[in-house]
Swiss-Prot record:
Basic residues bias locations: 65-107
Name under which the protein is recorded: Structural polyprotein
Mutagenesis or variant effect for A880S: In strain: A7
Positions of glycan attachment: N280, N327, N533, N595, N956, N1085
Membrane side Cytoplasmic: residue ranges: 723-755, 792, 1252-1253
Chain segments carrying region Transient transmembrane before p62-6K protein processing: 728-748
Consequence recorded when altering N85K: In strain: A7, L10 and MTV
Lineage, opening ranks: Viruses, Riboviria, Orthornavirae, Kitrinoviricota, Alsuviricetes
Effect caused by changing D890A: Shifts the pH threshold for fusion to a more acidic range
Length: 1253
């Protein structure tokens, strides 16, 4: 659902009122067609009378058009007013008059009321207005926190889409109501606006009102501008003293924005006072009207009244009132008050499958449930005894009361034992619940020592394996560590939101009350209320409170049971219930799950050894510790493992960066630098070694290619020389006595006819004249050298030109006056040089400080761990039961015939085969769902918010811009337009799951299609909504003979299975170094894409050239240079100027990035600047004010292989060839080229001469 309304209107019934004039309107007389003198005099007279009337009106108010006669009353004698509470009656009267005057609506309020008459509707809950819905554009909007339905038949039927991000519900307006809708606008100049209670001030992006002008119940009211357009919808407010800041939903140009001041409260009206019923009469739940409603006076009637009101909102007020018997006096709240509810309950005896000796029994300490939702490993155990209250219903934390037959006995709390594979440490106890910290184990046992010193125990199968908190599996809490969020059971006995169901206990059979006496059966009640049913004779059925005798009867013919409905007991599946309808009560339980922080250890820092593009970590864990790492490029290459012993791990570190996470320590990010062996400005083998370390494949390819070219050139040259000599000498060799001309002889090295061979000649010269020998040898060498140096000089002249041509082929970033493109990389400085005729150049510097990619989310549902609710079974003795349909998730109900259950006192029923048991079960959200649940969202278009720092001249400002589209902002009086981003990339899929502070890209099933044992087996919109869906494969089974229980089978929780198999969160493996955050879900600082920027700088941002220093004789000298290092170069600008001042400095190429943006200059001096480059031989132009100089440097590779910061320069440099390397290439290629050219010339000349013959 798009929460930006569409401006669709068919006409408005309201138009803004024209501005009021400060003078009364007078009827203008009609001028005569032919003016005359008398008419002019009459006109002057009328004007004078009007002026006189206006002066009188300024002194006294005008009379109404139809004055009403006032009734004259006799003046009453003045009496001294009586003082009441320090105030007189006159003061009270004045206060009332002031209140009446204050309630009169002002101009702004009246104007809003006219508009609101059509476009807003009340939202009502149980007949009371809780807020408002507003018609804006083509949509009806209602705050999501306002409970109730819209008080309009057409609008109440609409299907609303809910957005938790904006706290808003939205639906399309019916077509016939669009004429009632208000316009809206995103234009919000600072000033005053209107709403129902008067003026609203808008300043600094916040709406504020005087404190007291708004109140709960105003949620959903619109704020209008002076044209009647909606600019915002009120959600709540935050009291800030004399003024209240409003929490609103408003509109920007292309998106919806929610403004929530700190401390804001929702302004939905509080619900009405909860009412309860008694005998078809209603009353406030906290004020029962009858004396018998006091539990101490009539226990059973009071419990029945509570059962009748168990589902009403004021149930707990009624429970408190009935138990404390409020009589107008105030009761002190104390710890014992928390135990007061337990006087209406009692412990019980239930079936236990293992009573500690391998056999089953009916145990007074039967274990009902074990909860382990706390992440700190704490267990919350529920059993059938009660702790902290004695058998007299008094609070005593040293006692445990348990059921011993029909009686209640006390045990000492110190005898309580809880154990798994070892003894547990008990942290807290109250009522039916125990908090304990236990070692891992496969069973759980609870035991006490009764009054006869016998051990009463119950053991159940339970797998306890607490998971670690954080990234280290430790056992002992450290003295020093790191605090991280976790959950635990809060050790408090105060009332909580968690509750358990109670019900009336069943009639308990007890054969010990029967005795045989001379053919008669005697029933000994012992002060109890007993039901009896004997088949001997007639009429032997009833209830008695005293001993009685059944004549002529046997014990086997009688069935007696004790009935006691003065106390509730827990709704246990191991004890039958007394009533067939699902009557129940509820009580709060202690020890709620709470969000806290847990101290966890921090693994010892690893020993880090930096290598070339890799890092070696020596890990020394004290306990199993999680180690993970990822790269920060497009492919994260995530890896994780649990380390249990000292190991060594080597991790590759690319230029894009790497992040490793060791235990609970903070993640560490590292970047590699372009380090290598050799020298870029040394001998050829050193240069080859240098480039082989940086680009091994390219270097090998280049060297092999150049070698092949050299060999081919040499072989080709030799072949041409041999061919030329052959062509030259062949004709003369075939002609006897022919003489070879001396020119051909020189070219072809042809021997004379009378001369010896070359070897003989050279040997002769060596023996006879060595000086001539060396001259003969030096001549051709000299020729070759002369040709080589000539070619070298030609190449040197073209060197700079060819280098610049190649450099222009690379990626460069140039800044123009009104548009540029900056990289979307946090911390990367981007600078542009702006020139304007008549002004000194201006350096514009921009840097992305922070980015936030926030998708638009639509909550599909939440899922969490379920709990299976198994009410006490209903056993119908001597009859049949029937299941009824109930609107419960995954509800199951079955009736089993032929049951014959036993309780601790004997058979529950008197019949043998006509008994039936009604078993039912359903699924509900676990109590832990409030703290531990996963939310399934559908993600739509994401908005990218960037915080950009802009600096130019004297302006240094940081702005927030949305770069999905065009976003215009004003910085220092200059309009900048940012966006749209070059890449629409997002790390989020269209379906994501959010669990605590982790985000997962996961394809989850839609609402209503969950599968048992999988993610989404239970689904609901919120953790408290009534739209719970469940599919857990719950199936009931037939109870075992002779036992009272409700067996069932069910697929384990899909949520808990998902927690084990959920995999790695997007937080740790997001590409491009994204940092995933929640509340709201967003990706921070993703280094992807470029941001176009357009600007329109005024002339005032520049310095006139006549006012700026004039730089002359600017020269650049590079002192030191280390490439591929963060500002590892230092250069010095030497200059002369006509006056002192400030000059902007800038590098006009992406080959180098300057650290400084401005420099102070004097009449003569030097300026030292720092630069960063990735080139070994950078050559770049630096400007100081309007003067420019070329800087050339010979850079050395960095010494540090790994650094903890990213490079501040562009790594894309082409060609990255040092000047020395180019010189050696030119020398080698020049020599080979000269040799090849000489061979070509010889071949050409010989060929030409041969053709002339």
């Amino acid at each position: 659902m798009n929460y930006i309304p569409t401006q669709t209107f068919y006409g408005r019934r309201w138009r803004p009122r024209p501005a009021a004039r400060p003078w009364p309107l007078q009827a203008t007389p009609v001028a005569p067609v032919v003016p005359d003198f008398q008419a002019q005099q009459m006109q002057q007279l009328i004007s004078a009378v009007n002026a006189l009337t206006m002066r009188q009106n300024a002194i006294a108010p005008a009379r109404p058009p139809k004055p009403k006669k006032k009734k004259t009353t006799k003046p009453k004698p003045k009496t001294q007013p009586k003082k009441i509470n320090g105030k007189t009656q006159q003061q009270k009267k004045k206060d009332k008059q002031a209140d009446k005057k204050k309630k009169k609506p002002g101009k702004r309020e009246r104007m809003c009321m006219k508009i609101e008459n059509d476009c807003i509707f009340e939202v009502k809950h149980e007949g009371k207005v809780t807020g408002y819905a507003c018609l804006v554009g083509d949509k009806v909007m209602k705050p999501a926190h306002v409970k109730g339905v819209i008080d309009n038949a057409d609008l109440a039927k609409l299907a609303f889409k809910k957005s938790s991000k904006y706290d808003l519900e939205c639906a399309q307006i019916p077509v016939h109501m669009r004429s009632d809708a208000s316009k809206y606008t995103h234009e919000k100049p600072e000033g005053h606006y209107n709403w129902h209670h008067g003026a609203v001030q808008y300043s600094g992006g916040r709406f504020t009102i005087p404190t007291g002008a708004g109140k709960p119940g105003d949620s959903g009211r619109p704020i209008f501008d002076n044209k009647g357009r909606v600019v915002a919808i009120v959600l709540g407010g935050a009291n800030e003293g004399s003024r209240t800041a409003l929490s609103v939903v408003t509109w920007n140009k292309d998106m919806v924005t929610r403004v929530t001041p700190e401390g804001s409260e929702e302004w939905s009206a509080p619900l009405i006072t909860a009412m309860c019923v008694l005998a078809n009469a209603t009353f406030p739940c906290f004020q029962p009207p009858c004396v018998p409603c006091c539990y101490e006076n009539n226990a059973e009637a009071t419990l029945r009244m509570l059962e009748d009101n168990v589902d009403r909102p004021g149930y707990y007020d009624l429970l408190q009132a009935a138990l404390t018997c409020r009589n107008g006096t105030r009761h002190r709240r104390s710890v014992s008050q928390h135990f007061n509810v337990y006087k209406a309950t009692r412990p019980y005896i239930a079936y236990c499958a293992d009573c500690g000796a391998g056999h089953s029994c009916h145990s007074p300490v039967a274990i009902e449930a074990v909860r382990s939702e706390a992440t700190d490993g704490m267990l919350k155990i529920q059993f059938s005894a009660q702790i902290g209250i004695d058998k007299s219903d008094n609070h005593d934390y040293t006692k445990i009361r348990y059921a011993d037959g029909h009686a209640i006995e006390n045990a000492v709390r110190s005898s309580l034992k809880v154990a798994t594979s070892g003894d547990c440490f008990v942290h807290g106890t109250m009522g039916h619940f125990i908090l304990a910290k236990c070692p891992p184990g496969e069973f759980l046992q609870v035991s006490i020592q009764d009054t006869r010193n016998a051990v009463r125990a119950c053991r159940i199968q339970y797998h306890h394996d607490p998971q670690p908190v954080g990234r280290e599996k430790f056992t002992i809490r450290p003295h020093y560590g790191k605090e991280i969020p976790c959950t635990t059971y809060q050790q408090t006995t105060a009332e909580t939101v968690e509750e358990i169901d109670m019900h009336m206990p069943p009639d308990t059979p007890d054969r010990t009350l029967l005795s045989q006496q001379s053919g008669n059966v005697k029933i000994t009640v012992g002060g109890k209320k007993v039901k009896y049913n004997c088949t001997c004779g007639t009429g032997n059925v009833g209830t008695t409170n005293s001993d009685m005798t059944i004549n002529t009867c046997l014990i086997e013919q009688c069935h007696v049971s004790v009935t006691d409905h003065k106390k509730w007991q827990f709704n246990s599946p191991f004890v039958p219930r007394a009533d067939e309808p699902a009557r129940k009560g509820k009580v709060h339980i202690p020890f709620p799950l709470d969000n806290i922080t847990c101290r966890v250890p921090m693994a010892r820092e690893p020993t880090v050894i930096h290598g070339k593009r890799e890092v070696t970590l020596h890990l020394h864990p004290d306990h199993p510790t999680l180690f993970s790492y990822r790269t920060l490029g497009e492919d994260p290459q995530y890896h994780e493992e649990w380390v249990t012993a000292a190991v060594e791990r080597t991790i590759p570190v690319p230029v894009d960066g790497m992040e490793y996470h060791w235990g609970n320590n903070d993640p560490v990010r590292l970047w590699s630098q372009l380090t290598t062996e050799g020298k870029p400005h040394g001998w050829p083998h050193q240069i080859v070694q240098y480039y082989y370390g940086l680009y091994p494949a390219a270097t090998v390819s280049a060297v092999v290619g150049m070698s092949l070219l050299a060999l081919i050139s040499i072989f080709a040259s030799c072949y041409m020389l041999v061919a030329a000599r052959s062509k030259c000498l062949t004709p003369y060799a075939l002609t006897p006595g022919a003489a070879v001309p001396w020119t051909l002889g020189i070219l072809c090295c042809a021997p004379r006819a009378h001369a010896a061979s070359v070897a003989e000649t050279m040997a002769y010269l060596w023996d006879q004249n060595q000086a001539l020998f060396w001259l003969e040898f030096a001549a051709p060498v000299a020729c070759i050298l002369i040709i080589t140096y000539c070619l070298r000089n030609v190449l040197c002249c073209c060197k700079s030109l060819s280098f610049l041509v190649l450099l222009s082929l690379g990626a460069t970033a140039r800044a123009y006056e009104h548009s540029t493109v900056m990289p979307n990389v946090v911390g990367f400085p981007y600078k542009a040089h702006i020139e304007r005729p008549g002004y000194s150049p201006l350096t514009l510097q921009m840097q992305v400080v922070e980015t936030s990619l926030e998708p638009t989310l639509n909550l599909e549902y939440i899922t969490c761990e379920y709990k299976t609710v198994v009410p006490s079974p209903y056993v119908k003795c001597c009859g049949a039961s029937e299941c009824s349909t109930k609107e419960k998730p995954d509800y199951q109900c079955k009736v089993y015939t032929g049951v014959y259950p036993f309780m601790w006192g004997g058979a529950y029923c008197f019949c043998d085969s006509e008994n039936t048991q009604l078993s039912e079960a359903y699924v509900d959200r676990s109590d832990v769902c409030r703290h531990d649940h996963a939310s399934a969202y559908k993600a739509h278009t994401a908005s990218l918010k960037a915080k950009v720092r802009v600096m130019y001249g004297n302006v240094n400002q940081t702005v927030d811009v949305y770069v999905n589209g065009d976003h215009a902002v004003t910085i220092g009086g200059t309009q900048f337009i940012f966006g749209p981003l070059s890449s629409a990339w997002t790390p989020f899929d269209n379906k994501i799951v959010v669990y605590k502070d982790e985000v997962f890209n996961q394809d989850f099933p839609p609402y209503g299609s969950g599968q048992p044992g999988r993610f989404g087996d239970i689904q609901s919109r919120t953790v408290e909504s009534n739209d719970l869906y469940a599919n857990t494969a719950l199936k009931l089974a037939r109870p075992s003979p002779g036992m009272v229980h409700v067996p069932y089978t069910q697929t384990p929780s899909g949520f808990k299975y998902w927690l084990k198999e959920k995999g790695t969160a997007l937080n740790t493996k997001a590409p491009f170094g994204c940092q995933i955050k929640t509340n709201p879900v967003r990706a921070m600082n993703c280094a992807v894409g470029n941001i176009p920027v357009s600007m329109n700088l005024p002339d005032s941002a520049f310095t006139r050239i006549v006012e700026a220093p004039t730089i002359i004789d600017l020269t650049c000298t590079v002192a030191t240079c280390t490439h591929s290092s963060d500002f590892g170069g230092v250069l010095t600008l030497t200059y002369k100027t006509n006056k002192n001042g400030d000059c902007s400095v800038h590098s006009h190429s992406n080959v180098a990035t300057l650290q400084e943006a401005t420099a102070k200059v004097k009449t003569a001096g030097k300026v030292t600047l720092h630069f960063s480059t990735a080139s070994a031989s950078p050559s770049f132009v630096v400007s100081l004010c309007s003067a420019r100089a070329t800087c050339s440097a010979s850079c050395e590779p960095p010494k540090d292989h790994i650094v903890p910061y990213a490079a501040s320069h562009s790594n894309v440099v082409f060609p990255d060839m040092s000047g020395t390397a180019l010189s050696w290439v030119q020398k080698i290629s020049g020599g080979l080229g000269a040799f090849a050219i000489g061979a070509i010339l010889v071949l050409v000349v010989v060929t030409c001469i041969g053709l002339r013959r």
